[in-house]
Regions:
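Membrane transport/envelope proteins' first extracytoplasmic loop
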Residues: 1-298
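Interfacial "coupling" helices/loops that link adjacent transmembrane helices in transporter permeases
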Residues: 26, 300-340
Length: 341
């Protein structure tokens, strides 16, 4: 009887614990499938958490550099409250108000719109197809700024590897600089979520050292910060589905927070997560409803086995009492067995 009672308790515990496990696994599979469909249809990595700011031309250098320090720190704090593991992150800064001077044509200066850009941890996520990486600090001994570019950028800019060019700002009050394209890069891994945004952003970009951009180019007044972007690639595949309500609440707060500060916040899958929070509640209710008949049957089973066990033990309890055992002694005699069950 004790063995039967133990089996009943074991079945009840198994049924109760199976519901959240099954629900979590089901929602996880559904979410990953929908995320993959989202990526195929939009071309964007589903877990991208993106905050950007476009800076007006009248913004002073000190304010630009302060923003470079403040925005990544603000985003780091906010994204930490979202209970999704972080896969990768980077900060991108650029000046898209520059022109690359390609030469002259019949006495007319030939120029192409170019974007001077820099990003954190860039060298860890690329391989060089040709040439070399820009020098430490980004400025050669002869004072020329060293940059690297993609094949697409070279074609777009009509530039060549090891070519040296003059770059002029749209703002005529800024001094021109000279840049040397010392390397041609490509992504080290096509599936690296560091490159989660579309490649269109780098079609006409020359990449330089991050500190060189923020300290030398901005500090020296040769460039201006026109845009800053902080990207976090969140590993949605590892998200605990039990955290879904808190995740959607945190993201909803982030939309309000960034909007009040004048930043642009993008989380393409926010609507999907909101829908899944509702679906999770519905699925939980359905699963528990389906479990009720089984749980009632197990409850009756435990009740009947317990009654039979009590009837069986009555004679033994009577014998113990006849031998002078107190109720307290009898209770402690059966307590270990009940505790184990």
């Amino acid at each position: 009887m004790v063995l039967c009672l133990f089996i009943g308790f074991l079945m009840a515990a198994g049924m109760m614990s199976a519901v959240p496990i099954y629900m979590d696994a089901s929602l996880q599979r559904m979410l990953i499938k929908d995320m993959e469909s989202y990526q195929l249809s939009t071309g964007d990595f589903p877990g991208i958490y993106s905050v950007s700011k476009t800076i007006g031309s009248g913004t002073g250098t000190a304010e630009q550099r302060a923003l470079i320090d403040e925005l990544p720190a603000q985003v780091r704090e906010r994204v930490g409250a979202v209970r999704i593991p972080i896969g990768s992150s980077k900060t991108i800064v650029w000046d898209n108000l520059q022109y690359l001077i390609n030469g002259t044509n019949k006495g007319v200066v030939a120029s192409t719109r170019v974007k001077l850009a820099a990003m954190t941890d860039f060298s860890d996520h690329i391989v060089l197809k040709s040439g070399r990486m820009f020098c430490a600090g980004g400025v050669a001994e002869d004072g020329v700024y060293e940059v690297v570019a993609s094949d697409t950028a070279l074609k777009s800019l009509e530039a060549v590897l090891n070519g040296e060019y003059e770059v002029r700002s749209v703002d005529t009050g800024r001094e021109p600089i000279r840049v040397r394209i010392v390397g041609v890069y490509e992504q080290s891994d096509p599936n690296d979520i560091y490159w989660s945004e579309t490649a269109d952003r780098y079609v006409n970009a020359l990449i330089t050292d991050y500190n060189c951009f923020t300290e030398r180019l901005l500090g020296g007044g040769y460039a201006q910060l026109t845009d800053i972007l902080v990207n976090y690639a969140l590993s949605y595949q590892s998200m605990d589905m039990n955290d879904l309500p808190s995740v959607t609440a945190a993201l909803s707060d982030d939309f309000t927070y960034y909007n009040e500060l004048g930043y642009t916040f993008k989380m393409g899958i926010f609507k999907i997560l909101e829908e899944y929070a509702v679906e999770a509640e519905k699925l939980t209710g359905i699963l528990w409803t389906l479990q009720i008949p089984t749980m009632v049957m197990i409850a009756f089973y435990l009740f009947m086995v317990s009654r039979l066990n009590v009837e069986q033990e009555k004679n033994e309890i009577a014998i113990f009492k006849s031998r002078g055992s107190s109720s307290k002694q009898i209770f402690f005699l059966y307590a270990p067995e009940s505790g184990i069950l």
